A protein has these predicted regions:
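N-terminal, positively charged/glycine-rich alpha-helical extensions of SAM-dependent methyltransferases
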Residues: 1-15, 29
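Conserved alpha-helix/loop element of class I SAM-dependent methyltransferases that forms part
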Residues: 24-42
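Conserved class I S-adenosyl-L-methionine
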Residues: 40-52
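S-adenosyl-L-methionine
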Residues: 70-108, 112
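C-terminal substrate-binding/active-site "lid" region of AdoMet-derived donor-dependent transferases
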Residues: 76-79, 83, 120-184
Length: 184
């Protein structure tokens, strides 16, 4: 994964080949709204760092005491290390290098979690459902909040042990964005 600019000089994150878009600047407002709706608290786990839009929203939310992010890209690790220096020394900030599939089970429990990884397989629902199962089994406690970024309009099923809430969010998506639908 590497950082670059699109044809409008806006930030964009692409895969190693530069052909597949991973994240674009237009997502900033949506990511911040996701975190606002999640209302994270306590020790927060984030899957995927990207540009740090959601991380910034998490770290500026009152009641967040610790932040851990799992990130698999070395280029993103470098950006994260610069990012972390801007935040309150009273909040413990951790970077776990690797894929969530390989490291999640080694971590403890969390009060909140935001899932926004890069989809290497194009099977978003399968990937999130696997994560949700593993996270709930190994890392959640009673009252844990779980939120995620999705361009899917509907969720196929919700486990009965979860309260599930979805509300639409409308944003302007640039025409040259190849990975998101025009309306969420």
């Amino acid at each position: 994964i590497h950082y670059t600019k699109d044809q409008n000089d806006k930030d964009i994150l692409c895969d190693e080949s530069g052909d597949k878009q991973v994240m674009m600047e237009w997502e900033m407002g949506y990511m911040k709204e996701c975190i606002k709706r999640l209302q994270p608290k306590g020790h927060v786990l984030e899957i995927g760092f990207g540009f740090g839009y959601s991380a910034e929203a998490i770290l500026t939310t009152p009641g967040v005491t610790e932040y851990t992010v799992i990130e698999c890209s070395p280029e993103v690790w470098d950006r994260f290390e610069k990012f972390r220096t801007k935040y309150d020394e009273n909040i413990k900030i951790h970077l776990v290098r690797g894929r969530w599939q390989d490291v999640l089970y080694t971590l403890g429990t969390f009060d909140s979690c935001f899932f926004d990884d890069y989809d290497y397989t194009n099977k978003e629902r399968d990937r999130f459902e696997k994560f949700e199962y593993e996270f709930m089994k190994n890392n959640a406690i009673i009252g844990t909040r779980l939120g995620y970024y999705s361009t899917c309009e509907k969720r196929l099923g919700t486990p009965e042990y979860l309260d599930y809430d979805t509300r639409p969010y409308t944003t302007e998506i640039p025409e040259h964005c190849r990975y998101a639908k025009s309306v969420f």
